[in-house]
C-alpha cells in the first residue's frame, strides 16, 4: 500500500491523536503524513502540488471544481462541521470522492449557547410564569430540535418552523406565526439559494448545488423583520447571510431590538456600525466546546476508517477530562450561569478587536483559532452522546 497523505485544516481538534498510523489501522511500514494548513489557505495550488489522498476541512474551506480540478488523488473529503453549504456534493459524487460531515457534532454546544444568550440578557426567563416564554425556532434539524429539548426542559413554549420536515409537536407553525408570536426567534437553518436563479452566481464562493425550494439567504430581511414585535429577541448561530445585515441595522435603529449574532453576513469582516448595535456578538464560536470539537473529529475519523476498511480504535471519551458542568445543577442554581459559560467575555473579546471601524478578517480568525474551548453541560434527561 502507498503512504497516506492528508491535508487538514489545522484548527480541527486532536488531529495527531486520530490521524496516525495506529489509529488508522495502517501497518508499521506505511506512513501517514498529515499536512496542517489554515483553512482559508487550502487552495487549488496546494491541492495540485501535494496531491493528497484525504482532505479534512471546516466550513471556511469551499470544496468545488475550482479547488480540485488539478488534483487526481483525493478519495475522501471530511468536514468536521455540521453544515454542508461549503461543499459541492454533486461534484464530489461525479468524481467518486467519498464525503462525510460531522452531522450533529455540536448540537448541544450551540443549543447551550442560545440558552446562555437568552438567560444572560433576560434572566427573568429562569422563572416559570402564568404566561410561559415562547421560543420560536426556525430550522428543526440537529441543532434546532436539540434547542427545543432544552426549551421544553425549562418549561418554555415552542413554536417551530421547518418546511422540509413533517408536522410534529415542535414543527407546529408557519414562518409568519413564528416571527409574529415568539418572544425569542432563533435561527438554525443551512444557507441555501433559490432554484433556477442566477443569484448564487453573484455570490463569491457559492456552491453550485446549494439551492432549495425554501431558500434561506436573506430569510430575515426588511419585510420579515416587520412581522416581529420590537420586544422579540433575534438570535443567529446558523449562517451569516441568512440575515440581511443592512436591513437588520435599520431594524435595530427603529426598534431597539435585542439581537445576538455568532455569525455575520460578511464574515470574517464585521463593521463597527453593526457590532455596536448588537446585544451580544461572538466570533462564530457557538459550537466551540471540547466535546463538540472532538465529536466532529470522531465522526470524520470513523468515516475515514470505514473508507479504509479498518476498525476505529480511538474514542473521543478517551481524550476527555472529567466534566463537572451539570445541567441539573445549573437549573437549580441559575446564579452559576456565568461560571458555566461567560458569554459576555466572548462578546468583549470580539469588540476589543475593532480597529478603523471594523473587525479585520485576520483578527476574527485569530479569535476562533485561539479560542479556549468551553465544556458542554452534561445532562441525564438530554442525551449528549454521539
UniProtKB/Swiss-Prot annotation:
GO CC annotations, alphabetized: cytoplasm
| Molecular function as annotated in GO | 4-phosphoerythronate dehydrogenase activity; NAD binding; protein dimerization activity
* Binding residues annotated for NAD(+), in chain numbering: 162, 262, 287
List the Pfam families: 2-Hacid_dh (PF00389), 2-Hacid_dh_C (PF02826), DUF3410 (PF11890)
Any signal peptide, and if so, which residues?
Answer: none
Among the record's GO biological process terms, what is one?
pyridoxine biosynthetic process
Q: Which residues form the active site?
A: 239, 267, 284 (proton donor)
| UniProt catalytic activity | 4-phospho-D-erythronate + NAD(+) = (R)-3-hydroxy-2-oxo-4-phosphooxybutanoate + NADH + H(+)
Q: In which pathway does it act?
A: Cofactor biosynthesis; pyridoxine 5'-phosphate biosynthesis; pyridoxine 5'-phosphate from D-erythrose 4-phosphate: step 2/5
Record bears the keyword Cytoplasm: yes
Q: What keyword terms does UniProt attach to this protein? A: Cytoplasm, NAD, Oxidoreductase, Pyridoxine biosynthesis
Q: Report residues binding substrate.
A: 59, 81, 288
Instruction: State the protein's purpose.
Output: Catalyzes the oxidation of erythronate-4-phosphate to 3-hydroxy-2-oxo-4-phosphonooxybutanoate.
Q: Can you state the subunit structure given in the record?
A: Homodimer.
Listed HAMAP family: PdxB
Name of the protein: Erythronate-4-phosphate dehydrogenase
* Origin species: Psychrobacter cryohalolentis (strain ATCC BAA-1226 / DSM 17306 / VKM B-2378 / K5)
The lineage is: Bacteria, Pseudomonadati, Pseudomonadota, Gammaproteobacteria, Moraxellales
